[in-house]
């Protein structure tokens, strides 16, 4: 399976109408592969470009007993197979600079987690791979304060950049979305993604894990498209209530086609307004 070069992939993402979708974590290979094929089918039916997302290690879980993932070696093996068999590019995150190079051997997009968006060494290491880099805006960071993250990546020689809005802390155990962040961050000359599922998360809201209000995912995603976002990030799962990570805010896989068709229709309206 031939995949786009980093430059070609970034150009396609800059052309808008795309999704980054998949389970929160690689909890099971068969579940991940099933999800990847379903994401591709739903995206194609809606006329959207798709990238498969999932994490090989969830290093920022609430509890020491929380499921984290299969680890680097097995995780890269799984993602390589999913990438080849589904035909989708893949995005996954790193947490330490030394993880950038091995992850870049498989991933088309390297993602910087929200809590690590200011870590200079991590950003520079991701940039040095030459891959597209998606930096998630921290819940504690103002949209205009993401400009330095972009400047760090560019200073390291990488212009293939995405920024992702995923909500801002709003008191305790809650997030709120300020849609002004979309045009603000687009003003840095990069495509902007909206994370519709983490934005409905209730961080630590279940005590030993995070809660979520997935019923709000569609309205937040539609609002982001109406606000001019370039792409939408969606965690989805065949059975969210049994997911080992972020189930409360994950979108049911069987409801993904309808949601993507709604988003596609809204993106199409931009051309007639």
From Swiss-Prot:
S-S pairs: none
Location relative to the cell: Cytoplasm
Domain of life: Bacteria
GO biological process: keto-3-deoxy-D-manno-octulosonic acid biosynthetic process
InterPro entries, alphabetized: Aldolase_TIM, DAHP1/KDSA, KDO8P_synthase
Keyword Cytoplasm attached: yes
Keywords, alphabetical: Cytoplasm, Lipopolysaccharide biosynthesis, Transferase
Pfam name, any one: DAHP_synth_1
Pathway noted in the entry: Carbohydrate biosynthesis; 3-deoxy-D-manno-octulosonate biosynthesis; 3-deoxy-D-manno-octulosonate from D-ribulose 5-phosphate: step 2/3; Bacterial outer membrane biogenesis; lipopolysaccharide biosynthesis
Principal cellular location given in the protein's record: cytoplasm
Catalytic activity field: D-arabinose 5-phosphate + phosphoenolpyruvate + H2O = 3-deoxy-alpha-D-manno-2-octulosonate-8-phosphate + phosphate
Record GO terms (molecular function): 3-deoxy-8-phosphooctulonate synthase activity
Entry GO terms, CC: cytoplasm
Annotated EC: 2.5.1.55
Family matches, as NCBIfam families: KDO8P_synth, PRK05198.1
Family: Belongs to the KdsA family.
Protein name in the entry: 2-dehydro-3-deoxyphosphooctonate aldolase
Organism annotation: Nitratidesulfovibrio vulgaris (strain ATCC 29579 / DSM 644 / CCUG 34227 / NCIMB 8303 / VKM B-1760 / Hildenborough) (Desulfovibrio vulgaris)
């Amino acid at each position: 399976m031939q995949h786009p070069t980093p430059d070609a992939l970034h150009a396609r993402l800059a052309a808008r109408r795309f999704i980054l979708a998949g389970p929160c974590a690689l909890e099971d290979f068969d579940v991940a592969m099933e999800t990847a094929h379903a994401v591709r089918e739903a995206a194609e039916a809606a006329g959207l470009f798709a990238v498969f997302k999932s994490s090989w290690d969830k290093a920022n879980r609430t509890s020491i007993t929380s499921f984290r993932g299969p680890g680097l070696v097995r995780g890269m093996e799984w993602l390589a197979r999913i990438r080849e068999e589904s035909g989708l590019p893949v995005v996954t995150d790193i947490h330490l600079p030394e993880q950038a190079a091995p992850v870049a051997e498989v991933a088309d997009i390297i993602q910087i987690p929200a809590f690590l968006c200011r870590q200079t060494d991590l950003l520079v290491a991701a940039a040095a791979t030459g891959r597209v880099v998606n930096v998630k805006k921290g819940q504690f960071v103002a949209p205009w304060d993401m400009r330095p993250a972009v400047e760090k990546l560019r200073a390291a020689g990488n212009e293939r950049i995405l920024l992702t809005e995923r909500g801002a802390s709003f008191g305790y155990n809650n997030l709120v979305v300020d849609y002004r962040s979309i045009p603000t961050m687009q003003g840095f000359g990069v495509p902007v993604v909206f994370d519709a599922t983490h934005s409905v998360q209730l961080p630590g809201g279940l005590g030993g894990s995070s809660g979520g209000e997935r019923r709000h995912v569609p309205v937040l995603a539609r609002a982001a498209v109406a606000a001019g976002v370039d792409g939408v990030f969606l965690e989805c799962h065949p059975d969210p209530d049994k997911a080992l990570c972020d189930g409360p805010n994950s979108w049911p896989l069987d409801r993904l086609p309808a949601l993507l068709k709604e988003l596609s229709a809204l993106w199409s309206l931009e051309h007639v307004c």
